[in-house]
Structures are given as structure tokens and as C-alpha cells.
């Protein structure tokens, strides 16, 4: 894919879409399958950069797996234990938080000599909250360069026990502890300090652990968790990965802005993904939503402004911010501090790039206000190597003005076929389709 991509103005949106498997589920079940007994067949696997980093890491850790030709089915052979590697190895994990954080916790269980590292941005994403919690349970982890950030040197030693963790930065820290705890020598009691962000992702983790034979006790409204130690993960033999609801938000938003209608297949109303709440927010904004058994249909209606707390759906919240420039009144998204520690500082990035296309934007430490735009300006959008920035700003081509995305290939992190899918629902008048 070229270094920049100009999307021409779209006349209207219409079509049906099949969304690849969830990134959050894919990397979790790959890891849980590797830790389980025997063979697990995973269907509808997402095959993107973040997943490739996890697969390469598992291979280096001694796990054998097979992908089918479409790379959407993975047969993985587990070892029924935590990983223990005799030689000193280095695992490069790109900017994949869903690989870095859980692998750090799991690799802390056994005697190891493993370095975890990644891209420049990964080395800027704080991880000390998880490191501190693992150290409370006996883990021997040191920072290779800058304190509080990767790369990390792991020697093992985590035994469980009473652990405190800050829940206000990233739910992945707590998810990582939860996944490691059943394999620890001792029972683990986790006490969450401060407000827990992205709670649906914790529910997702616990749901998947249950599918692999482990139960987690949730006490005191997600402030306290209890997991028995010295357990084994048990393979479900087969597991079908839900389509990624975070990825679906861009197509739902496209219909809300410029429909026509969109039907997204492979999504159920009772999804285990927290971003199902994005669809509820669309309804609150006046968008027409119709559910079928295994799909959802979104049709354009009015698009109202909204004030919404997006603490639990930080990724989908970015799409809501884009809807703000198309809505009748402002969109106010609050309680999103963790945008600042994602693939980039997303509050800064969204504000900066939205202003380029003519939007009025007000931001604070943990909020963003986006006002409707009357006259859109063609702009070159810096994507900050952030897949969600690129996918969000693709929607600006629905404004009647073209938009140019720099480094569009960053979508490969989670959705390599995004532009192919996007073009498939775009209909143009008197211009050629984008190539």
C-alpha cells in the first residue's frame, strides 16, 4: 500500500459486510490455547500484525500451530502449563499491547530469561503498573532501558498471593494478571485501586477463561477478584471467534452518516464484546438499528449530538468523535483518559487532525468535545501509525470532500482488509472508484 491514500467523496453507502474476528479475543484465545491441554481449533481468527506478533512469540516459546490457507483457522497444540524456556530469548512484539501485557504476566510464572521488546511507541507506553503488581507476587522483572517502560527482562518467580493493581490506566493489566493467576503456586487475591477502566474487557477475559475451564470470583463490584492457584487450563477443543465489534463501528457509522443501509454479518445482540454498546449509543443519537439472528442492519436517520461516558468503550469512542462533525449538535465524550496511553495520544491526535478538516474541538485531560462542521476542508491526515486514526478519518470522505490519509498501511495492525471492505460499500457518482 502506498505512503498516502486519497479517498474521494462518496455519494452514498449501501451493502453487506463480513468483519474479521476480534483482535482482543484472537490474542487471548491463542494464548489460552497454548497454555491448555492438547489441540484447540480456533475459527474466524483475525490475521493481522498484532496477531502475527503473538503467533511468532508462541513459536519461539515452543508452541506448534497450523494455519489454513485463508489464515482464518488456527490449530494450536497446547503444553498444559506455563512457558519455561532454557535459553535466553528476545520476543519482539511490535506495538501489540494485547501480546505484550499478557505475555509479561504468563512468562513471570516460570524460571525464564526472556526479554520483551517492541516498536518505538511500545517503549513509550507505561507498563509499570503491571510490573509492580507482578513483583508483589514475587516476579523478578527488570527494566532494560527506561524505568516504567519496555523493554523488560523477565526471570520468573510470580507465585500469586495478595496483589494490588491500579485499574485506572488499562484493563489489559488486570486481564493479564487474571490469566496468569490460575497457573500460580498460590491462590491469588487481586484488589483493584482507583476506577476500573474498560470493564467490559475484564468481563471478556473472564468469559474466555471460563471457556477454558477456569472460574474467577468477582467481589465488591469489580474491586476484588479471587482465583485459585495450581490449576490447569482445559481446551474447549473448538472455539469460534466473534467478529470484531471495534472494527464494525466504522461501517455502522458510515451508514449513519451517508446511508443507505449496512448489514454487518457475524454479530449478535448478546455479544461478549463491550463495544456492543456502540450500537446502543447510535440508537440514542437517532440512528435506525435492526437486529437479525446473526447480523445487524444500520440505516441513516437523524444524527443527534450526545454527551456520553466512554470509560468502558475507549476504542469505539473514537468513531463517536468522528460522528460529531456530522451530527446536528456537539458530541461530548468524557472519561477517556486512557486514550492518552494507546497506540498514540489519541486525544491529542484526534483533536489535531479534526481541526485540519475544519472542526471546532475542545479537549481536556480526559475528554473531547467535537462540534458539527458546515464546510469541510480537504486535509492530509497524519495517522500517527495508529490503525484507528486511519479508519476513523476514512469516514471524512462521506462529507462531500476528499481526504488524504498518510501511512494508511497502519490498518494492518488489526484490519488488513479494511479499505477493500470500505470500498465495497461506497457508491460514487460521476467519479471513478478509488483504487
UniProtKB/Swiss-Prot annotation:
Coiled coil: none annotated. It is found in: Cytoplasm. Keywords: Amino-acid biosynthesis, Aromatic amino acid biosynthesis, Cytoplasm, Transferase. Catalyzes the transfer of the enolpyruvyl moiety of phosphoenolpyruvate (PEP) to the 5-hydroxyl of shikimate-3-phosphate (S3P) to produce enolpyruvyl shikimate-3-phosphate and inorganic phosphate. It is an enzyme of class 2 (transferase). Its EC number is 2.5.1.19. Signal peptide: none annotated. Its main location: cytoplasm. InterPro entries: Enolpyruvate_Tfrase_dom (IPR001986), Enolpyruvate_Tfrase_sf (IPR036968), EPSP_synthase (IPR006264), EPSP_synthase_CS (IPR023193), RNA3'P_cycl/enolpyr_Trfase_a/b (IPR013792). GO terms for biological process: amino acid biosynthetic process; aromatic amino acid family biosynthetic process; chorismate biosynthetic process. The keyword Metal-binding does not apply. Belongs to the EPSP synthase family. It comes from the Bacteria. GO terms for cellular component: cytoplasm. It catalyses: 3-phosphoshikimate + phosphoenolpyruvate = 5-O-(1-carboxyvinyl)-3-phosphoshikimate + phosphate. GO terms for molecular function: 3-phosphoshikimate 1-carboxyvinyltransferase activity. The active site is at 315 (proton acceptor). Phosphoenolpyruvate binds at residues 23, 97, 125, 172, 346, 388, 413. Pathway: Metabolic intermediate biosynthesis; chorismate biosynthesis; chorismate from D-erythrose 4-phosphate and phosphoenolpyruvate: step 6/7. 3-phosphoshikimate binds at residues 23-24, 28, 170-172, 198, 315, 338, 342. Monomer. The keyword Cytoplasm applies. This is 3-phosphoshikimate 1-carboxyvinyltransferase. Pfam families: EPSP_synthase.
Amino acid at each position: 500500500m502506498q505512503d498516502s491514500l486519497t479517498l474521494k467523496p462518496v455519494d452514498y453507502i449501501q451493502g453487506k459486510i463480513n468483519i474479521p474476528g476480534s483482535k482482543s479475543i484472537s490474542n487471548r484465545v491463542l494464548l489460552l490455547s497454548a497454555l491448555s491441554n492438547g489441540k484447540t481449533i480456533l475459527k474466524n481468527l483475525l490475521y493481522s500484525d498484532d496477531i502475527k506478533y503473538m503467533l511468532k512469540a508462541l513459536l519461539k516459546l515452543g508452541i506448534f500451530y497450523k494455519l489454513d490457507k485463508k489464515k482464518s483457522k488456527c490449530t494450536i497444540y497446547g503444553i498444559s502449563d506455563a512457558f519455561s524456556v532454557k535459553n535466553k530469548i528476545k520476543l519482539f512484539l511490535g506495538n501489540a499491547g494485547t501480546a505484550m501485557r499478557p505475555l509479561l504476566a504468563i512468562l513471570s510464572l516460570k524460571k525464564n530469561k526472556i526479554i520483551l521488546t517492541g516498536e518505538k511507541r511500545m517503549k513509550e507506553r507505561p507498563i509499570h503498573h503491571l510490573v509492580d503488581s507482578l513483583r508483589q507476587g514475587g516476579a523478578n522483572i527488570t527494566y532494560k532501558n527506561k524505568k516504567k517502560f519496555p523493554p523488560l527482562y523477565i526471570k520468573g518467580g510470580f507465585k500469586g498471593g495478595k496483589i494490588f493493581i491500579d485499574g485506572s490506566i488499562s484493563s489489559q493489566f488486570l486481564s493479564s494478571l487474571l490469566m496468569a493467576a490460575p497457573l500460580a503456586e498460590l491462590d491469588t487475591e487481586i484488589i483493584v485501586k482507583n476506577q476500573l477502566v474498560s470493564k467490559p474487557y475484564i468481563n471478556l477475559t473472564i468469559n474466555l477463561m471460563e471457556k477454558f475451564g477456569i472460574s474467577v470470583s468477582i467481589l465488591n463490584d469489580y474491586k476484588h477478584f479471587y482465583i485459585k492457584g495450581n490449576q490447569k487450563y482445559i481446551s474447549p477443543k473448538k472455539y469460534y471467534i466473534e467478529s470484531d465489534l471495534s472494527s464494525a463501528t466504522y461501517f455502522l457509522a458510515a451508514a449513519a452518516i451517508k446511508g443507505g443501509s449496512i448489514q454487518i454479518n457475524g454479530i449478535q445482540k448478546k455479544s461478549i464484546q463491550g463495544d456492543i454498546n456502540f450500537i446502543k449509543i447510535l440508537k440514542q443519537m437517532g440512528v435506525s438499528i435492526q437486529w437479525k439472528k446473526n447480523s445487524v442492519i444500520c440505516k441513516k436517520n437523524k444524527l443527534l449530538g450526545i454527551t456520553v461516558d466512554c470509560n468502558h468503550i475507549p476504542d469505539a469512542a473514537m468513531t463517536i468523535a468522528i460522528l460529531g462533525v456530522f451530527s446536528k449538535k456537539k458530541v461530548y465524550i468524557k472519561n477517556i483518559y486512557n486514550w492518552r496511553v494507546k497506540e498514540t495520544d489519541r486525544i491529542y491526535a484526534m483533536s489535531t487532525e479534526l481541526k485540519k478538516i475544519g472542526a471546532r474541538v475542545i479537549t481536556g485531560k480526559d475528554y473531547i468535545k467535537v462540534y458539527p462542521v458546515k464546510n469541510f476542508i480537504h486535509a492530509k491526515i497524519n495517522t500517527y501509525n495508529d490503525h484507528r486514526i486511519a479508519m476513523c478519518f476514512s469516514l471524512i470522505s462521506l462529507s462531500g470532500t476528499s481526504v488524504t490519509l498518510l501511512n494508511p498501511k497502519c490498518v494492518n495492525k488489526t484490519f488488513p482488509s479494511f479499505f477493500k471492505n470500505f470500498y465495497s460499500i461506497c457508491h460514487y457518482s460521476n467519479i471513478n472508484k478509488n483504487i
